[in-house]
């Protein structure tokens, strides 16, 4: 008497495991930089909001820019902003995040020094006036 066996053979199971491994090898690198991109987005957003706050402050103070404490700006969680005003001529700011080594910079007008990035993108000028620029991933 012959019994019908049910189930998968070892070869079938190995093929499934190999297919899952290939899919994982494709998907994991795509999502590996997701957190890093989120940190950079938070820093860029804070720099844009800081620029708006600086301009509002300067319009109230007859064109004189202030640092982050004077203008009353608080960044997102984990983001540290260092603003260097140059009186009524301009200002610059550097944003860092506690969870990444990357940084973002911005300047407006004539700052005391134009900020530089440690790893600037090659496709654009390292820093353009009024436009937050970040290190590349």
Model-derived regions, located:
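Short, intrinsically disordered, low-complexity terminal segments
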Residues: 21, 35, 90-92
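Short, contiguous, well-ordered secondary-structure segments
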Residues: 1-2, 56
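Hydrophobic transmembrane-helix microenvironments that flank and shape a buried ionizable site
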Residues: 9, 43, 51-52
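Aliphatic-rich helix starts adjacent to a transmembrane/signal segment
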Residues: 30-47
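N-terminal single-pass transmembrane signal-anchor helix
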Residues: 2-31
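Periplasmic/extracellular, small/polar-rich flexible segments of pilin-like filament-forming proteins
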Residues: 48, 52-137
């Amino acid at each position: 008497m012959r019994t019908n066996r049910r189930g998968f053979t070892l070869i079938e199971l190995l093929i499934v495991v190999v297919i899952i491994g290939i899919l994982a090898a494709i998907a994991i690198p795509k999502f590996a930089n997701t957190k890093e991109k989120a940190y950079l987005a938070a820093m860029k957003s804070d720099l844009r909001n800081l620029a708006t706050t600086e301009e509002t402050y300067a319009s109230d103070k007859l064109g004189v820019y202030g640092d982050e404490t004077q203008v009353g700006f608080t960044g997102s969680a984990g983001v540290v902003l260092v603003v260097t005003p140059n009186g009524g001529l301009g200002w610059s700011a550097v944003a860092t995040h506690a969870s990444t080594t990357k940084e973002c910079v911005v300047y407006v007008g004539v700052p005391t020094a134009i900020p530089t990035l440690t790893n600037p993108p090659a496709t654009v000028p390292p820093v353009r006036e009024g436009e937050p620029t970040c290190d590349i991933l």
